[in-house]
Amino acid sequence: AAASDNFMRF
């Protein structure tokens, strides 16, 4: 999921 990966990126 892109949203999940994006959150972990921060």
From Swiss-Prot:
Tissue specificity of this protein: Detected in the thoracic perisympathetic organs in larvae, and the dorsal ganglionic sheath in adults (at protein level).
Transmembrane residue ranges: none
Annotated keywords: Amidation, Neuropeptide, Secreted
GO terms under biological process: neuropeptide signaling pathway
GO CC field: extracellular region
Residues with Phenylalanine amide modification: 10
Subcellular localization: Secreted
Family to which the UniProt record says this protein belongs: Belongs to the FARP (FMRFamide related peptide) family.
Protein name in UniProt: FMRFamide-6
Record organism: Lucilia cuprina (Green bottle fly)
Lineage of origin: Eukaryota, Metazoa, Ecdysozoa, Arthropoda, Hexapoda
